[in-house]
Every structure is written in C-alpha cells, then in structure tokens.
Amino acid sequence: MFIGTYNHSIDSKNRMLIPSKVKATLNEVTFVYLSLGFDENIDMRLESEFNQFVDNINNLPIGSREARNLTRLLLSQTYKVEIDSASRILIPQNLIDKAKIKKDIYIIGTNDRYEIWAKEVYDDFSLNQEDTLSDLAEKLLINGI
C-alpha cells in the first residue's frame, strides 16, 4: 500500500529522484510504469499494480467506443521506466507537459500507485477539495464504500 505526500522536484533533464521513503515501498524493483493520470497528474505503478490496471482495462466492453478510446489514450501514453543506480527515473516529456510540471512536484501515495503532481496543480486541487472531504466521505460511505 502506497501512502503519504512527498514534496520534491525534477531536474532540468526531467529526472526525478525517488524519495527514500517511496523507494522503500518499491521492493527493490528496477523499473516502474508511468502513465497519464485522470486528474492532470502522472501515475507511477509497480509491475503487479500495472498488470492489474491493464486487466481492469481489458474487462471493459470492446464494443464500446468510449472503452476503446480510453484504452488507446491510457496505454499509448504509458512508459516502462528504469530506476537508475542513483534512484532516479526519467519522466517522458509528453507526460511532463500534460501534467503541467515545471520543477516542483508532489508525490502522493494513493493505495495502489503513486501520483506525481505539479505543485501548483495539486495545491489548486487540494484547496478545492478540502471543503468537500466530508461530503465525499458521506456519499461513499452511504453507498457502502
């Protein structure tokens, strides 16, 4: 399970040093999968979590245009990225651009993945969500989640 929030940055070559607490949860893997997230962020998954994610996508109805488009958009923008000897990953430029990352980032643990957010984008998201936390919890708990 991935949890926590880490304030970090990327260098001028689009490399992100994986924080030691995050690295400790990655079980000494040598690569991760990076893909475009749903909220102007980048998702970082281990292979097992990525395989589960793909299984979920594969269960979408192939006859649905929306399902096919979602599959294309998600998987065509997914990269298997090596963790180098200095515990860094190279984030592809198109993901950097789509996530609006300049330099400062947050790495957010969200149970089955880490999300990489541009600091400004996440700060805006957080401000807009704090007032609705109790509303979201109430709605989801009523529905048994």
Curated annotation (Swiss-Prot):
It comes from the Bacteria. GO terms for cellular component: cytoplasm; nucleoid. Keywords: Cytoplasm, DNA-binding, Repeat, Transcription, Transcription regulation. GO terms for molecular function: DNA-binding transcription factor activity; transcription cis-regulatory region binding. SUPFAM superfamilies: AbrB/MazE/MraZ-like. The keyword Transcription applies. The keyword Cytoplasm applies. GO terms for biological process: negative regulation of DNA-templated transcription initiation. Disulfide bonds: none annotated. Residues 5-49, 78-121 form the SpoVT-AbrB domain. It is found in: Cytoplasm, Nucleoid. Forms oligomers. PANTHER family: TRANSCRIPTIONAL REGULATOR MRAZ. Belongs to the MraZ family. NCBIfam families: division/cell wall cluster transcriptional repressor MraZ. This is Transcriptional regulator MraZ.
